[in-house]
Amino acid sequence: MKFLDEAKVYVRSGDGGAGCVSFRREKFIEFGGPDGGDGGRGGDVWAECVEGLNTLIDYRYQQHFKAKKGEHGSGRNRAGAKGGDVVLKVPAGTQILAEDRETLVADLTRVGQRVLLARGGNGGFGNAYFTTSTNRAPRHANPGQEGQEHWLWLRLKLIADAGLVGLPNAGKSTFLATVTAAKPKIADYPFTTLHPGLGVVRVDTREFVLADIPGLIEGAHEGVGLGDRFLAHVERCRVLLHLVEGTSEDAGAAYRLVRAELEAYGHGLADKPEIVALSKADILDPERLEAQVASLEAACGRRPLVISAATRRGVPEALRALLAAMDRAQAEAAPEKAEAWQP
């Protein structure tokens, strides 16, 4: 399935149906009086978070969504039927923004969440509504109200517990394929990963979702390479696993480069808990490995993990470190319970 994480859509709710001008006509009833019914309300436009989706690709092929108009009222006090609704189905993690791309309309993070995007117009009153003590036969009715229309942006931010960051070819996709059932494209050239991927990690008796995004390079926040637009998909992660390629010239410099891009991007990414690991340890000789570990330790200020996704060296330790960091982050984010009132 192709991946799309941003789409622009036009939504319009249905117009309300017009009220009816009608009079009761029956045998032996000389003055039947007005019996025009009200118009039906126009259909609404909703957005609903559904299970089984992880892309907005459907909105590349259809951008206009219009609900049905309400039906007109008719005689014998019959009201018009309500217009049919339109529902935009989106994956969990979808943000809905106004046309200016800054005003947040809704943030759908749970399956089953619904938000009203455009309310249908009210139906007009029939002439029976306007009957008064001085006007027993009104000959006018209301037209229905017009529906609402908007241009909106849909922006997907994948929901994962932990995210992988690093330079291209740091081994992120290999790590994801090793610890989950995901099958990302893996090759020995930069930018093999062109869109984010998700996988479910099982550690002992627990599970969490891990996200892999395309690699960052120097100047990514200015649009160099694939840019930093995919960093939005790790904004919701509680913890980052920063992989640094062991075969790079200087592991410490590679680490600092990615950290600089995270800080330039903002949105709190640089402040998230981070597990640092030196990858591809299986192809380094002991002397070179120790030098890279020392360089990385000097850059990040703590002893990094040493892993190899190919041989699974250090992988269980990295996963357990992620779990522990997630537990700490969740405990810090949990609001303190207020003490119960006692007389």
Swiss-Prot record:
Q: Name one GO cellular component term.
A: cytoplasm
State the Gene Ontology terms under molecular function: GTP binding; GTPase activity; magnesium ion binding
Question: Which BP terms from GO are recorded?
Answer: ribosome biogenesis
Cofactor dependence: Mg(2+)
Residue span(s) of domain Obg: 1-159
Binding locations of Mg(2+): 173, 193
Task: Quote the EC number.
Answer: 3.6.5.-
- In which family does this protein belong, per the annotation? Belongs to the TRAFAC class OBG-HflX-like GTPase superfamily. OBG GTPase family.
Q: Quaternary form?
A: Monomer.
Official protein name in the record? GTPase Obg
Q: Which organism is it from?
A: Methylobacterium sp. (strain 4-46)
Q: What is the lineage of its organism?
A: Bacteria, Pseudomonadati, Pseudomonadota, Alphaproteobacteria, Hyphomicrobiales
| Gene giving rise to this polypeptide | obg
